[in-house]
């Protein structure tokens, strides 16, 4: 399972600002197992988040988080800790 807390925003689309009509483009967001996306976090299009990751409240995720069982926070996010892998089911 994965937990997505209140106010989190997963934005899988954007617009081409060089297009005269701001053409929409999309990329899927992939989130692994045992992930916690904390409150008010923004995750940008095309981002992949590995299993067991925690993303701290009000963080901005614009790049993949590939290292499993880590804790990330900030604008943009950076790794601030690690989790115990034994916590998973």
What is each model feature region?
Residues 1-48, 57, 75-76, 80-88:
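Flexible, glycine/small-residue-enriched loop-and-beta-strand segment within the central core
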Residues 33, 51-52, 68-69:
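Short acidic capping loops at alpha-helix termini that bridge into adjacent secondary structure
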Residues 66-76:
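Acidic, glycine-centered active-site loop in nucleotide-sugar glycosyltransferases
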């Amino acid at each position: 399972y994965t937990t997505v807390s209140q106010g989190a925003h997963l934005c899988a689309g954007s617009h081409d600002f060089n297009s005269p009509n701001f053409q929409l483009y999309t990329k899927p967001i992939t989130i692994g197992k045992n992930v916690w996306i904390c409150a008010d976090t923004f995750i940008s299009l095309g981002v992949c988040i590995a299993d067991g990751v925690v993303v701290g409240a009000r963080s901005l995720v614009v790049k993949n988080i590939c290292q499993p069982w880590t804790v990330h926070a900030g604008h943009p996010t950076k790794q601030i800790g690690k989790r115990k892998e034994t916590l998973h089911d």
